[in-house]
Amino acid sequence: MAANVKVLVVLALLQLMSLHAVVHGGDNGGVSAVATGKHEPKPKQGGGGGGGDGGCHISGFLHGKAGKCNRAHGSDCCVTGRRYPQFRCSPPVSSARPTPATLTLNSFARGGDGGGRSSCDGRFHPDTAMVVALSSGWLRLDGASRCNRMIRVAAGNGRSALARVVDECDSVNGCDAEHNFEPPCPNDVVDGSPAVWKALGLDEGVGEFKVTWSDV
């Protein structure tokens, strides 16, 4: 009788262990494996930008070439021989809700880290101007040219600001003088002037923030 009780106890323990493995996924898989798949590196999330890449994937690679790079505002300067991802698209924009993005900092002034003149109007803009650049897909490659249009940028602290789109954060080209010898942009960037950062109440020293933006 005692032997039968022991057998029943062992069987009960085995069932409990099996149930635990199913619920928690064991030591190596289950929930953590799903989480890993969910947060796989995307085309720089910026790639992928905030909120998912919407089917926008890397279209190629640019071979880096180092040069005279203005490192103001934490510029990521090209390294010779390194491969940098290129994107010919951006996450989809919906009129029903704001679009998640990564806000970066850029000077559009002459001699600033923005490189050449703004592509939309052929001008430089002082750091006090409320201006932004958008990743290539959002600026023009999704069929809706946003040059010289106004957008609203909203930060997680409850602040928002209106800014004019004056330039392209080029997601295809880079590592040359025109682009301050910086790599191509991720596909989900709103590159804002110091004035935009100030209006949003954000610390320039952080370098980038998750924000949303929408057409006005």
Curated annotation (Swiss-Prot):
Keywords: Secreted, Signal. Its main location: secreted. Gene3D superfamilies: RlpA-like domain (2.40.40.10). Pfam families: KWL1. CDD domains: DPBB_kiwellin-like. It is found in: Secreted. Residues 1-25 form the signal peptide. The keyword Secreted applies. GO terms for cellular component: extracellular region. InterPro entries: Kiwellin-like (IPR039271), RlpA-like_sf (IPR036908). It comes from the Eukaryota. Belongs to the kiwellin family. PANTHER family: RIPENING-RELATED PROTEIN 2-RELATED, RIPENING-RELATED PROTEIN 4-RELATED. This is Putative ripening-related protein 4.
